[in-house]
Every structure is written in C-alpha cells, then in structure tokens.
Amino acid sequence: MLDNTGQVLRTIGKHGSGDGEFNFPTELRLRNGLLAVVDAMNFRVQIFDSGDRLVGKIGKMGDSSGQMYRPKGIAIDSEDHIYLVEGLWGVVQVFDREGQLLYTFGQRGTRLGDFQLPAGLFIDNSDGVYVVDSYNRRVQVFQYHGLRAQAEGAKP
C-alpha cells in the first residue's frame, strides 16, 4: 500500500506457499472490507480483512468443483460471495467468504452462457456480473438475485 507521495506504507505477504504467502499473485478485489487475492501458482484465493489478517482461503489445485487450475478474474458481490473465473474449464465458481463452494455457472463452449478462456470478471453495485469471455470475443452479463431476493419472494 502506498501513500499519496508513493512511499510504501505496508505490504501483505511474501513469497511462499504458507498462509498469507503468495506464489504469483495475479489479481485482487477489495469490497465490503474484504481483500481477495488470486494466488495463481498456489492454486488458491486468499481472503484478508481490513486489518490484513487472513480470514479465509479458497481452493486447491484440481479439476473438480471448488478446485482450480488457472484461476483468473475475481470479484465480490454485495453479500460477500466471492466469484472466481476458472480460465481452463470455462466456468465461474461462487464461494462464500469461508471458502465453501455455493454454485458454479457456465461451461466450455460458444453458446450464450458458455465460455472459452474466460479471463476477467467484474461485479457492479447492483450485483450485475460481467465475464470477459476472451476466445469468444465478448463480455457476457448476468444478474445475481441473491439470498436477499429469495427472502423477499423473488425468484433467483
């Protein structure tokens, strides 16, 4: 972290594979006091609170749901769900802040809702989910209705 003169105020982590350490961090998102960092070569996401304390980890290397091989884009929605683009499989995995897989969406392909080499992800203030679908040369937009919407009687 830098101040307005460019001086380093603090850093988070160091090289390694332990808790709070990184091996090729590639992306991060900050929302609702959570900092989620894609730790690509450790095949995980690490989650820190506003005091830079590690509060959660997501994933491990593998090819099953909840695992990752080429983690790419990351985002956090208004309910603190963490969305992770898995570039190799063409899916988006959604986790709670404790790292439990909630659901996935997408698959490898060219139809609407499919992805080929997804490379980025953004969630707007209305929980619109934007996925950069690089090989298909498009950005796909989805709307998450969430648990709050279910409680109010809306259909997810």
PLM regions with names:
Residues 1-156:
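Eukaryotic scaffold repeat domains enriched in small/polar residues
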